[in-house]
């Protein structure tokens, strides 16, 4: 059956700020306490969505989550009216207010792991929201993520939306940022590739400086609940040294699409064995793996982390050629820019490079790949998505005007204490649910 890969980008929320919450994420730590521009952030992401939609790619949008999270703050012991809760948190524990106010759900690569119907035992598209249990500000996302996915992908004939795995370190799950899929064609059975940072119950190398957020046990559990064939599921360990260099998810050091793996030479432990396993598995599915390995001598791990070369989108055009979507920081790094010029001029599958200004997201450690969740849908499955979430001229104009009406153009850490920010955010989100036709999605609407 004909199928297409859709990208569902997260719309940046009104509380986008730089609180430095993500240990192991170099950009997040380096920009802590800077002033952010939520309006610019949202518009940068929206423009990327629109340009890709204009190029013929299936492009959807996922709404922001409600922030600040009053539920979290009340759970942590702050009481009173909403304004009182925010004031108390700001005075007594500003770091907790920052966690409750994070707009990190914009990075939908961490929202869930998705397996298309061609790969699953029951022939449905399966979603497992990521528990993101390694960081407080992200661990509060999965319930709202499940509600959103269950709203958009509501037909049980076509879709299965699971609950997140239990939020324990042994099952630390960071979603699609550590998962990719290889196939001959999107609608045919493929190979699902899970990358983990450490294993809880068996010995192996681990990073020493920064935490490994994804466990083997979590990856395996997701594969099992999605009903994936064992012979079509491959696991690999990320090199702990690159985690210590700031590669906190695999999508900061490699990206895959269809028959192509674009990766840094230092991405994996026992890389040749991984390449061989992937090659054999994909060969059984009727395709030949094409590995584009970037040598450390051309692009160092530090270059990769600062430019986010691999936190790119690798997209297939209708004619089979591939385009690489990168942040503008790739053009500002001489080594990376030179490599991309050689890549596009070569005879490989990647023929074009598209460059986007995503500066606001990048300063928090999120490039093009972080902002999108890949969902392969056949024609019947796409028709079952009835919400108004597919980017076109009309929706783009509505969302662009909505951002103008509701978003601030400056938000510093101290502004999180402003009780008006909660009211502004709720007003914006209430209107957004009408634009997207997703019903009463948020707690404050119920």
Curated annotation (Swiss-Prot):
Active site as annotated: 174, 249, 370 (nucleophile)
Keyword Coiled coil part of the UniProt annotation: no
Pathway as given in its UniProt record: Amino-acid degradation; L-arginine degradation via AST pathway; L-glutamate and succinate from L-arginine: step 2/5
Binding site for substrate: 19-28, 110, 137-138, 213, 251, 364
InterPro entries: AstB_sf (IPR037031), SuccinylArg_d-Hdrlase_AstB (IPR007079)
Alphabetical UniProt keywords: Arginine metabolism, Hydrolase
Superkingdom field: Bacteria
Enzyme Commission numbers on file: 3.5.3.23
Record flagged with keyword Phosphoprotein: no
Sample GO molecular function, one term: N-succinylarginine dihydrolase activity
Gene Ontology biological process terms, A to Z: arginine catabolic process to glutamate; arginine catabolic process to succinate
Catalytic EC class: hydrolase
Signal sequence region: none
Reactions catalysed: N(2)-succinyl-L-arginine + 2 H2O + 2 H(+) = N(2)-succinyl-L-ornithine + 2 NH4(+) + CO2
Function recorded in the entry: Catalyzes the hydrolysis of N(2)-succinylarginine into N(2)-succinylornithine, ammonia and CO(2).
NCBIfam families referenced in this protein's UniProt entry, alphabetically: arg_catab_astB (TIGR03241), PRK13281.1 (NF009789)
Annotated HAMAP family: AstB
Similarity annotation: Belongs to the succinylarginine dihydrolase family.
Subunit comment: Homodimer.
Protein name (database record): N-succinylarginine dihydrolase
Species: Burkholderia orbicola (strain MC0-3)
């Amino acid at each position: 059956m004909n199928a297409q890969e859709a990208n569902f980008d997260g719309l940046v929320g009104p509380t986008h700020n730089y609180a430095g919450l993500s240990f192991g994420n170099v950009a997040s730590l380096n920009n802590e306490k800077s002033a952010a521009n939520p309006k610019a952030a949202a518009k940068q992401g929206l423009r990327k969505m629109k340009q890709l939609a204009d190029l013929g790619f299936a492009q959807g949008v996922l709404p922001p989550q409600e922030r600040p999270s009053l539920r979290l703050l009340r759970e942590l012991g702050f009481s009173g009216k909403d304004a009182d809760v925010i004031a108390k948190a700001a005075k007594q524990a500003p770091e907790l207010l920052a966690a409750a106010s994070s707009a990190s759900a914009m990075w939908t690569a961490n929202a869930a792991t998705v397996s298309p119907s061609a790969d699953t035992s029951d022939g449905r598209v399966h979603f497992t929201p990521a528990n993101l249990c390694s960081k407080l500000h992200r661990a509060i996302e999965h319930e709202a993520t499940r509600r959103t996915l269950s709203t958009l992908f509501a037909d049980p004939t076509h879709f299965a939306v699971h609950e997140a795995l239990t939020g324990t370190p042994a099952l630390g799950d960071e979603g699609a940022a550590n998962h990719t899929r290889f196939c001959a064609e999107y609608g045919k059975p493929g190979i699902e590739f899970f990358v983990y940072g450490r294993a809880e119950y068996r010995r192996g190398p681990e990073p020493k400086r920064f935490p490994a957020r994804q466990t083997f046990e979590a990856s395996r559990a997701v594969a099992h609940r999605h009903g994936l064939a064992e012979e079509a599921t491959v696991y690999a360990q990320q090199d702990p040294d690159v985690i210590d260099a700031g590669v906190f998810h695999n999508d900061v050091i490699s990206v895959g699409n269809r028959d192509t793996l674009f990766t840094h030479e230092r991405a994996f432990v026992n890389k040749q064995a991984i390449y061989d396993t992937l090659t054999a598995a994909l060969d059984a599915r009727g395709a030949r793996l094409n590995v584009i390995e970037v040598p450390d001598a051309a692009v160092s791990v530090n270059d990769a982390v600062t430019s986010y070369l691999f936190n790119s989108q690798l997209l297939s055009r209708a004619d089979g050629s591939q385009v690489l979507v990168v942040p503008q920081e790739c053009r500002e790094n001489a080594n990376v820019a030179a490599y991309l010029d050689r890549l596009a001029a070569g005879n490989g599958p990647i023929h074009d490079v598209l460059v986007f200004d995503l500066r606001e997201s990048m300063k928090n450690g999120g490039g093009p790949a972080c902002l999108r969740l890949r969902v392969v849908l056949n024609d019947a499955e796409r028709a079952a998505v009835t919400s108004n979430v597919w980017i076109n001229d009309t929706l783009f104009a509505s969302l662009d005007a909505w951002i103008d009406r509701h978003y601030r153009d400056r938000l510093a850490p101290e502004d999180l204490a402003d009780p008006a920010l909660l009211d502004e955010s709720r007003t914006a989100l209430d209107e957004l649910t009408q634009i997207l036709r997703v019903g009463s999605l948020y707690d404050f609407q119920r």
